């Protein structure tokens, strides 16, 4: 009888520890960036380069791949001369553990949080046909994603996904402004939103 009870207890404990990989058994959606407007540009070519991200810090999404997809879909050359360069020069995801602000919970090692500090440094440049730099700038985007240390794997992945989505929305607004207002290389009447 004791053995059966032990086996039952182990099964209950292991069942409670396992977490579904994704909410409601469904995989996280892919970040396709289809909700962001692509920009037609009055240049003949685009040059996209992405440096590997430093320290992915147990992050559910690959920042390098997402950045390459974003830039490839965002920049659409439609002109006959010149080139636009979009280079992810630096990016990182750093995990910082934060203790609980409650002294009692902190004493027992409870109530803390994991903070993912995501940083992107994107270089945008416009060159004329002669290869001269017409305009160049660097866009920095930062986001802190805070997750309770007690969150399930599914909740962590979902929160990370939402945090990156917000980071890319902020980055997209800056990229639109630079390409359309500062570089003035947009075509097709695309609006900055």
What are these model-predicted stretches?
Residues 3-10:
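Sec-dependent signal peptide recognition
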Residues 13-16:
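C-terminal motif of bacterial Sec signal peptides marking the signal peptidase cleavage site
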Residues 42-51, 129-156:
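Short acidic, glycine/tyrosine-flanked loop/strand segments centered on an H-E-D-like triad
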């Amino acid at each position: 009888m004791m053995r059966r009870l032990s086996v039952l207890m182990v099964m209950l404990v292991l069942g409670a520890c396992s977490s579904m990989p994704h909410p409601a058994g469904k995989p996280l959606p892919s970040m396709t960036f289809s909700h962001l407007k692509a920009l037609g540009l009055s240049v003949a070519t685009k040059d996209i380069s992405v440096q590997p991200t430093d320290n992915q810090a147990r992050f559910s999404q690959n920042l390098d791949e997402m950045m390459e997809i974003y830039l490839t879909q965002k920049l659409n050359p439609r002109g006959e001369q010149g080139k636009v360069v979009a280079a992810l020069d630096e990016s990182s995801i750093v995990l910082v553990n934060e203790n609980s602000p409650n002294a009692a919970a902190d004493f027992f090692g409870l109530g803390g949080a994991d903070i993912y500090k995501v940083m992107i440094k994107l270089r945008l440049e416009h060159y004329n046909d002669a290869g001269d730099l017409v305009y160049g700038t660097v866009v920095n985007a930062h986001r802190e994603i805070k997750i309770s240390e007690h969150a399930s794997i599914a909740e962590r992945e979902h929160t990370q996904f939402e945090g990156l989505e917000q980071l890319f929305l902020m980055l997209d607004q800056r990229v639109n402004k630079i390409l359309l207002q500062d570089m003035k290389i947009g075509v097709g009447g695309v609006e900055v939103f």
